[in-house]
Each structure stands twice: as C-alpha cells, then as structure tokens.
C-alpha cells in the first residue's frame, strides 16, 4: 500500500488567513511633517479683564443648578416636567443637619459622607404631573421647614439617578 503524503488540511487550518494580506507598505504613502503653529490657537486674552471668580467663602454650593438664584415654584415645576418627559421617577429627599458633603466617620468617600439623605415617603412611581411633586414638596417643607430638600429624577430602567437639584434650603442659606 502506498502512503499518501499528509496534505489533508484540518478544519482550523483551512479557515486561517495570512495576516495583513494585500496591505501596502508605508513607503508607498507620502509623508508630510507638520510644523506646530501656535499662532492660530484660540485665545480669550481680551476677555480676561471681564472675568470674575466666584467667592468661595460663605457661598457653599450643593449640586446641579446651585450656582443659580433660588428657583421659583414655576421654575421648579418646569424642571420636574423635564424629568417626567424623560420618563424618570421623581423622588424627594431631605437633610436636617448637613446640607453639604461632610466627613464624619472616615476620610475617604463612602456611605456616611453626607451624600445620602433621607427619602421623603416613597419614589413617585406613576407620577405624570409636576403638580403632584410640588404638592409633596410643600408637605415636606411644612413638616421640616429648616431642611434642605432636593428633587431627584431616577431612571428605573438603567437603575441610575439622572438629575438632582436643591428645591428648598433653610433660611440663611
């Protein structure tokens, strides 16, 4: 019996392709060196004289929208309408002592650093009108007049908080 040379390919070998088949070498492409020209970079040099720095003392900031003046009831309702349009679940949270991030039990960020506030009642699943949220906000303000109160928009599909802003602050803040 005559032996047949081992020319039968396995399935894995039959599907293999040589790497980079048909690519041209870099020598075929022209290379141009660009000179770094910094004369066309944007500049705000003329406007620096008009800029101001936000005073850091006595003006603590909280989170989204906190650099704006206090929002009116109608502005708050528009923000709530925005989160409802995005199909986020409104929630109210309040804090009685520390409206700012603080470190009480550890130096590193964690659960007890002032970012987690007490939730007012339950998340408002099924809420379709900003008036419902504003009514709950008024109830919370009536119950805790010296509390920081914020409104949160929670995406229950992605399980993330998408928006959070201060709705009410104690007097003097």
UniProtKB/Swiss-Prot annotation:
Transit peptide extent on chain: 1-49
GO CC list: chloroplast
Biological processes annotated in GO: photorespiration; reductive pentose-phosphate cycle
Ranges that cross the membrane: none
Keyword Chloroplast: yes
Single GO MF descriptor: ribulose-bisphosphate carboxylase activity
Keyword Transmembrane helix recorded: no
Keywords, ordered alphabetically: Calvin cycle, Carbon dioxide fixation, Chloroplast, Photorespiration, Photosynthesis, Plastid, Transit peptide
Subunit-level organization: Heterohexadecamer of 8 large and 8 small subunits.
Family (UniProt): Belongs to the RuBisCO small chain family.
Note: The basic functional RuBisCO is composed of a large chain homodimer in a 'head-to-tail' conformation. In form I RuBisCO this homodimer is arranged in a barrel-like tetramer with the small subunits forming a tetrameric 'cap' on each end of the 'barrel'.
Role played: RuBisCO catalyzes two reactions: the carboxylation of D-ribulose 1,5-bisphosphate, the primary event in carbon dioxide fixation, as well as the oxidative fragmentation of the pentose substrate. Both reactions occur simultaneously and in competition at the same active site. Although the small subunit is not catalytic it is essential for maximal activity.
Protein's name according to its UniProt entry: Ribulose bisphosphate carboxylase small subunit, chloroplastic 3
Lineage, top ranks: Eukaryota, Viridiplantae, Streptophyta, Embryophyta, Tracheophyta
């Amino acid at each position: 019996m005559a032996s047949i040379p081992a020319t039968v390919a396995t399935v894995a070998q039959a599907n293999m392709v040589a790497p980079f088949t048909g690519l041209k070498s870099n020598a075929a492409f022209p290379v141009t060196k660009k000179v770094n020209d910094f004369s066309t970079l944007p500049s705000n040099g003329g406007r620096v004289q008009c800029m101001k720095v936000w005073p850091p003392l006595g003006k603590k900031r909280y989170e989204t929208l906190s650099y704006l003046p206090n929002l009116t009831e109608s502005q708050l309702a528009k923000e709530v309408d925005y989160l409802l349009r995005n199909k986020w679940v409104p929630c109210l949270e309040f804090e009685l002592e520390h409206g700012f991030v603080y470190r009480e039990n550890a130096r590193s960020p964690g659960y007890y650093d002032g970012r987690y506030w007490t939730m007012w009642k339950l998340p408002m699943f099924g809420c379709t009108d900003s008036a419902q949220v504003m009514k709950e906000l008024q109830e919370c303000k009536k119950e805790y007049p010296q509390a920081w109160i914020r409104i949160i928009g929670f995406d229950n599909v992605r399980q993330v908080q998408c928006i959070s802003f201060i709705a009410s602050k104690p007097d003097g803040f």
